[in-house]
């Protein structure tokens, strides 16, 4: 998945995290453990080590078994709402698709994954509902949740995601464990119960107070919320911030209003304020990591303090503020594992943030670079900067896979590939573009894939605006696109948008789409020409800086 280093809500992958979620899901921890390979690999036990990231699935397929920190290379892939053309290294991706034993695409649209593989079998398309054909909660980037209603019944044979998941769980034999506290109507789990289960477990981020009932109340009374600060003025949700942006501490019954702005100590915790989390201990190398002389207003502790635990409540004399039921649940627990929410409730009643009050961490001692520093890209036209700003050494295993840095950067490709290539977004399209390029009004606005080239470079190459050109990346991937000659890019730099797909290295794949399902606009995927490179902390792919050559087609 996108964050393969943690269970939901940043609990991590240690045994305690699995035990927490086993309690939330009401399944036996040993049963969960028994579903994992118990072999110790370079990265450790698979259950407790980060998985292969979505950015590296290609290498998860193509690497030899003995090079991977798990039993075998990947044999099957689910592309669930995933745009493969938004990932780098297109030619290697096609090879990986061909090596897989099975591909499953779950999406309202066939997507590029359904047509670029060049396979004749082992590919399954599962039509998923759009947002208009299902109901439930969604979370926006400001951390607010919204409840949405179904507009129309699912078209054709499409199904909502949670029903598809349930049907898969049935086939795999763990549907009962998946839905132990979730009502299932026919084959469709009740979406409200799914959110309630999320609320029951995600204490770390305060995704616990946003019950379906509270979100529906917000939905019905949109008009009572301010467009300026999101807060309701009167009405049933008086004082709440719209969508109860997380952290919305405690249980729904505690009625925390949500936190519209993170790390604001000028507001009481009970009203959405907080300091920085005491996430990294209380001291390091003799330096106090807790806040000094700073705390959220109206709190009974006016200095730094660690994360709240049952023992901390006892030491402060606040333990008896818990109900008897809360005491039974909180004994031996902390603010993020107490399923009653009592520890959070009592801390907040005393004006304290449950996660503690610490200093912001500027020196990240767990990262390869403890403070940000420039490292020259693996592929660069500035070879003079490589010695001054070298990349990292290769990693034997990172997120289960060998990850290359220095061994790539040591090779000088700049004579053959003299132009820096970057990629990015357009206003008209989103992501891999499958949905937006299938909308006639948007498709009319951007009908062709292109590369932006500086006028000086165009003159040096011998091309004009509107010419068809080949853009070849430093690993040999090529795209056939129109040249847009413009000073918007600097001399020696080219730009391509990444929203296009359906043409692969000059080959039009239109006929491979199911009848009537091809987008209005097809084009080369920019990432066919992009190259290897991954951030060592997150394994995020390098899409912004590689090198290329451009020539007339």
Model-derived regions, located:
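Hydrophobic alpha-helical scaffolding
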Residues: 67, 82-83, 138, 150-158, ...
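Phosphate/diphosphate-binding loops
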Residues: 101-110, 151-170, 470-472
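Long, contiguous, secondary-structure-rich segments that constitute the structural scaffold
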Residues: 163-212, 300, 310-314, 319-328, ...
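Short conserved micro-motifs at the rims of enzyme active sites and ligand-binding pockets
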Residues: 89-90, 116, 136-139, 156-157, ...
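Extended redox/cofactor-interaction regions of prokaryotic respiratory oxidoreductases
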Residues: 1-122, 127-135, 218-461
């Amino acid at each position: 998945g996108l964050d393969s280093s943690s269970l939901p809500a940043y609990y991590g992958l240690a045994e305690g995290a699995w035990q927490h979620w086993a309690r939330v899901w009401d399944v036996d921890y040993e049963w969960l453990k028994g579903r994992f390979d118990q072999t110790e690999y370079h990265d450790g036990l698979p259950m407790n080590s980060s998985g292969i990231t979505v950015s590296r699935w290609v290498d998860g397929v193509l690497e030899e078994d003995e090079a991977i920190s798990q039993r075998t290379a990947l044999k099957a892939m689910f592309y669930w709402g995933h745009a493969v053309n938004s990932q780098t290294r297109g030619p290697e991706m096609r090879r990986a698709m061909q090596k897989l034993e099975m591909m499953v695409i779950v999406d309202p649209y066939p997507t590029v994954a359904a047509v670029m593989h060049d396979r004749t079998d082992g590919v399954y398309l599962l039509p998923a509902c759009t947002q208009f054909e299902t109901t439930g909660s969604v979370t926006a980037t400001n951390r607010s949740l919204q409840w949405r209603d179904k507009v129309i019944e699912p078209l054709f044979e499409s199904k909502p995601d949670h029903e598809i998941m349930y049907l898969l769980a049935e086939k795999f034999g763990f549907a009962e464990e998946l839905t132990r506290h979730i009502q299932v109507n026919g084959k469709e789990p009740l979406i409200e119960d799914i959110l309630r289960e999320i609320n029951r477990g995600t204490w770390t981020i305060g995704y616990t107070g946003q019950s379906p009932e509270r979100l529906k109340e917000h939905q019905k009374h949109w008009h009572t919320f301010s467009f300026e600060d999101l807060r309701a003025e009167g009405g049933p949700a008086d004082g709440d911030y719209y969508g109860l942006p997380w952290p919305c501490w405690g249980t729904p019954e505690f009625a925390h209003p949500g936190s519209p702005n993170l790390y604001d100590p000028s507001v009481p915790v009970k009203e959405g304020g907080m300091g920085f989390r005491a996430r990294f201990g209380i001291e390091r190398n003799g330096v106090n990591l807790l806040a000094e002389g700073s705390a959220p207003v109206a709190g009974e502790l006016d200095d730094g303090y660690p994360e709240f635990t049952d023992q901390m409540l006892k030491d402060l004399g606040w333990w008896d503020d818990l109900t008897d039921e809360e005491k039974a649940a909180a004994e031996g627990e902390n603010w993020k594992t107490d399923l009653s929410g009592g520890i959070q409730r009592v801390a907040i009643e005393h004006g304290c943030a449950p996660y503690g009050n610490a200093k912001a961490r500027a020196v990240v001692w767990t990262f390869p670079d403890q403070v940000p520093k420039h490292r020259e890209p693996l592929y660069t036209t500035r070879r003079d900067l490589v010695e001054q700003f070298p990349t990292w050494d290769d990693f034997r295993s990172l997120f289960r896979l060998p990850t290359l840095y220095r061994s790539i950067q040591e090779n000088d490709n700049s004579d053959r590939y003299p132009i820096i290539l970057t990629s990015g977004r357009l206003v008209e399209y989103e992501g891999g573009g499958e949905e937006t390029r299938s909308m006639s009004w948007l498709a009319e606005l951007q009908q062709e894939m292109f590369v932006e080239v500086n006028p000086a470079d165009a003159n040096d190459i011998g091309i004009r605006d509107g010419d068809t050109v080949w853009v070849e990346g430093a690993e040999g991937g090529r795209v056939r696109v129109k040249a847009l000659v413009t000073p918007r890019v600097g001399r020696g730099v080219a730009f391509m948008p990444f929203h296009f797909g359906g043409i692969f290295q000059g080959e039009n794949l239109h006929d491979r789409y199911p009848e009537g399902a091809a987008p209005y606009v097809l084009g080369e995927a920019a990432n066919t020409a992009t190259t290897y490179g991954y951030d060592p902390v997150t394994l995020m792919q390098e899409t912004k800086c590689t090198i290329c050559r451009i020539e007339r087609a």
